[in-house]
Regions:
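Conserved beta-loop-beta element that borders a ligand/cofactor-binding pocket
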Residues: 101, 133-158
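Hydrophobic/small residue at the entry helix of a nucleotide-binding pocket
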Residues: 10
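Substrate-binding strand-loop-helix patch
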Residues: 158, 186-193, 213-233, 242-250, ...
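Terminal hydrophobic/aromatic helix or amphipathic segment near a protein terminus
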Residues: 227-274
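Conserved Rossmann-fold NAD(P)-dependent oxidoreductase catalytic core, especially the SDR/UDP-sugar
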Residues: 24-26, 83-130, 147
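Amphipathic terminal alpha-helices
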Residues: 281, 289-305
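Substrate-positioning beta->alpha
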Residues: 159-166, 180-203, 210-214
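NAD(P)H-binding glycine-rich loop region in Rossmannoid oxidoreductase-like domains
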Residues: 33-35, 40-91
């Protein structure tokens, strides 16, 4: 059995992939939501309750942290949830597989590789760093087995993030994309399907344990180029992409929680932000989904909606 905490795009994709492979899956969310499919059990529970989560994880081969607290609640929500996940993994013997991101690296001036150190200094970004450090310390102490997959901004149907919400959801219908940062800066976009495949691989391959891995991700393109290619793939002309000046973004953040939180990660879009996943690809034989395939499916979905 595999236990997944969270039923967002990543948790859902991972559960469906495991179920397709004949595995039994238990998804834990506060409201018991998630995909309805053979082999998938939906459980309503507070995953931050260590005893409850440990009971739900008993006998599991792997425990996947696919939770995604609202960004403005990271400092309050992540610590108890992370502690509960560690307790459940240690108690049950399940491999703890965490869906991570690139926030822990902080601003970078070169592509992020397997060897790039975690150097974030903002308290919210450091939260994710500490989560991994705590899991790694427990792994090295022999208390549990842990690994982590780190992806760039998500791409693909059903995913949330800058590419879909600020660009493709608008441009696929002939509208204008309004984006923060530099719309021409190269950026890595990771397909949700590739995240799921990587998580399942890390859970079942002992070579992955005790390390963090970058999810296979195609070559970077700017958000302007991504929107252009997406439109071309569904037969639309190149869209208009407008930049939101930082002072405007800052001011809008006074009235909108999400925009306010984007100030913290604005650096990821103000300059090239690139992921080099070649090490993961070489070790596990995984390859990223071609970006055009992901863009075409996403744009077609928005066009038809």
């Amino acid at each position: 059995m595999h236990v997944i905490v969270g039923a967002g795009p990543v948790g859902t994709a991972t559960a469906l992939l495991l179920a397709e492979r004949g595995e039994q899956v238990r998804i834990v969310t506060r409201r018991g939501t998630g995909p309805q499919a053979p082999g998938i059990e939906l459980v309503a529970a507070d995953a931050a309750d260590p005893n409850r989560l440990a009971a739900l994880t008993e006998g599991a081969a792997a425990l996947y942290n696919c939770a995604n607290p609202a960004y403005h609640r990271w400092l309050t929500d992540w610590p108890p949830l992370a502690a509960s996940l560690l307790h459940a993994a240690e108690t049950s013997g399940a491999v703890l597989v965490t869906m991570g991101n690139l926030y822990g690296y902080g601003p970078v001036t070169a592509p992020i590789t397997h060897d790039t150190p975690l150097a974030a200094t903002h308290p919210k970004l450091v939260t994710r760093v500490r989560m991994w450090e705590d899991a790694l310390a427990a792994h090295r102490a022999g208390r549990l087995r842990a690994t982590e997959a780190r992806a760039s901004d998500f791409a693909g149907p059903g995913s949330y993030g800058v590419l879909n919400e600020m660009a493709l959801s608008r441009t696929a219908k002939g509208g204008t994309a309004y984006v923060m940062g530099d719309p021409d800066a190269p950026h890595s976009w990771t397909a949700i399907a590739d995240v799921a495949r990587t998580l399942v691989t890390l859970a079942t391959d002992e070579r992955a344990w005790g390390q963090a891995w970058l999810v296979p991700t195609p070559p970077p393109v700017s958000i302007r180029e991504a929107a252009r290619r997406a439109n071309e793939l569904i037969g639309l002309p190149a869209p208009r992409v407008a930049r939101i000046p930082y002072p405007v973004l800052w001011t809008a953040g006074l009235f909108n929680t999400m925009l306010r939180e984007m100030r913290t990660t604005h650096y990821q879009f103000a300059a090239p932000f690139v992921l080099d996943s070649s090490h993961t690809e070489q070790v596990f034989g995984l390859k990223p989904t071609p970006l055009d395939d992901t863009l075409a499916a996403t744009a077609a979905g928005y066009r038809a909606a």
